[in-house]
Amino acid sequence: MILNSSTEDGIKRIQDDCPKAGRHSYIFVMIPTLYSIIFVVGIFGNSLVVIVIYFYMKLKTVASVFLLNLALADICFLLTLPLWAVYTAMEYRWPFGNYLCKIASASVSFNLYASVFLLTCLSIDRYLAIVHPMKSRLRRTMLVAKVTCVIIWLMAGLASLPAVIHRNVFFIENTNITVCAFHYESQNSTLPIGLGLTKNILGFMFPFLIILTSYTLIWKALKKAYEIQKNKPRNDDIFKIIMAIVLFFFFSWVPHQIFTFLDVLIQLGIIHDCKISDIVDTAMPITICIAYFNNCLNPLFYGFLGKKFKKYFLQLLKYIPPKAKSHSTLSTKMSTLSYRPSDNVSSSAKKPVQCFEVE
């Protein structure tokens, strides 16, 4: 818990009740190393995703619009990751000034909300494309997808404003270090619990319920399709993919959300024990690594569910340039079921194996 003290030279001086919380030598080595790995892998992977979707696949489908924006949001976050790596390696000493403190903090918050919102919209799009391919054709347009992405970026920007306003550089007098941190003027302030609940509910619980519902309905539709088409072999890979998507999202974010909530309780003074503060402050950067590393892999994960994406991705790795002209395909080509229970369309020759493709 941090207590307010005084202000000098434009930098607020504060006292830390638990100055040793989270300050371990292995954290100062392990976390910067993990950040560096996430930065290299994330920048490389997401840059390739952007190139493949924009230059090779020509951004023709709704799903590709969401994936492109997901990769761009990840890149924006990854560009600030070296700052956090240096910050942690210097034992939580912030050398970059107040403006970069705000920008880097806002980038972390922005990526959280933008990525979660985009994944939620992608799950809704998959549901509409698979379960209601005909009815949703007029709604699942490129214009709607692009407008949705603009709204998502604006919402993520608004959700990140508290980081811009309340994240600042502080000098901790009893440890003699300058940190980039949230600081609340009063323990009675409702702001920290409001921000914490917003992150828990808007940044995880509500999107997870939508994602879980969407893929559960897809699961049921696929099972019904297989029951009707008993003469066709069942492909359990689709069900494994659905399970992987839901569990991947859940276990990536649950640890971070739990420790975020505990951190709010510490900031409010509800938890006073320095041992608990040490556990939370030690675990927090580890949960960040788990959440954001998985987050940065999402564009590749979702992209590789499509055959065309894999084809173009391998072409790019082999330095094969995109074709100047590309024959367009209908947006509704991706992810239609051979049996369409909601649209009363008879079975076709297509198999439901392609239900998660993004081309």
Curated annotation (Swiss-Prot):
**A Pfam family the protein falls into:** 7tm_1
User: Where in the cell is the protein located?
Assistant: Cell membrane
Tell me the Gene Ontology biological-process terms attached to this UniProt entry.
Answer: calcium-mediated signaling; immune response; kidney development; maintenance of blood vessel diameter homeostasis by renin-angiotensin; neutrophil chemotaxis; positive regulation of blood vessel endothelial cell proliferation involved in sprouting angiogenesis; positive regulation of cytosolic calcium ion concentration; positive regulation of macrophage derived foam cell differentiation
**Extracellular membrane side:** 1-25, 90-98, 166-190, 269-278
Residue ranges under compositional bias (Polar residues)? 337-349
Instruction: State the InterPro entries in the record.
Output: ATII_AT1_rcpt, ATII_rcpt, CCR1-9-like, GPCR_Rhodpsn, GPCR_Rhodpsn_7TM
Gene3D superfamilies given in the database record: Rhodopsin 7-helix transmembrane proteins
Q: What Gene Ontology cellular component terms go with this record?
A: external side of plasma membrane
Listed A to Z, the keywords are:
Cell membrane, Disulfide bond, G-protein coupled receptor, Glycoprotein, Lipoprotein, Membrane, Palmitate, Phosphoprotein, Receptor, Transducer, Transmembrane, Transmembrane helix
> Which regions face the Cytoplasmic side of the membrane?
56-61, 126-141, 217-239, 305-359
Q: Where are glycans found on this sequence?
A: N4, N176, N188
Q: Which cysteines are joined by disulfide bonds?
A: C18-C274, C101-C180
Region annotated Disordered, chain positions: 337-359
Q: Tell me what PTMs the record reports for this protein.
A: C-terminal Ser or Thr residues may be phosphorylated.
Q: Molecular function (GO) terms listed?
A: angiotensin type I receptor activity; angiotensin type II receptor activity; bradykinin receptor binding; C-C chemokine binding; C-C chemokine receptor activity; protein heterodimerization activity
Q: Which residues bind angiotensin II?
A: Q15, D17, R167, F182, H183, Y184, K199
Main localization category: membrane
What is this protein's tissue specificity according to the annotation?
Expressed in liver, kidney, adrenal gland, heart and colon.
Lipid-bearing positions (S-palmitoyl cysteine) = C355
Q: Which residues cross the membrane?
A: 26-55, 62-89, 99-125, 142-165, 191-216, 240-268, 279-304
Q: How does it sit in the membrane?
A: Multi-pass membrane protein
User: Assembly and partners?
Assistant: Interacts with MAS1. Interacts with ARRB1. Interacts with FLNA (via filamin repeat 21); increases PKA-mediated phosphorylation of FLNA.
Q: What does this protein do?
A: Receptor for angiotensin II, a vasoconstricting peptide, which acts as a key regulator of blood pressure and sodium retention by the kidney. The activated receptor in turn couples to G-alpha proteins G(q) (GNAQ, GNA11, GNA14 or GNA15) and thus activates phospholipase C and increases the cytosolic Ca(2+) concentrations, which in turn triggers cellular responses such as stimulation of protein kinase C.
Q: Which family does it belong to?
A: Belongs to the G-protein coupled receptor 1 family.
* UniProt protein name: Type-1 angiotensin II receptor
Instruction: Please give the organism.
Output: Cavia porcellus
Q: What gene codes for this chain?
A: AGTR1
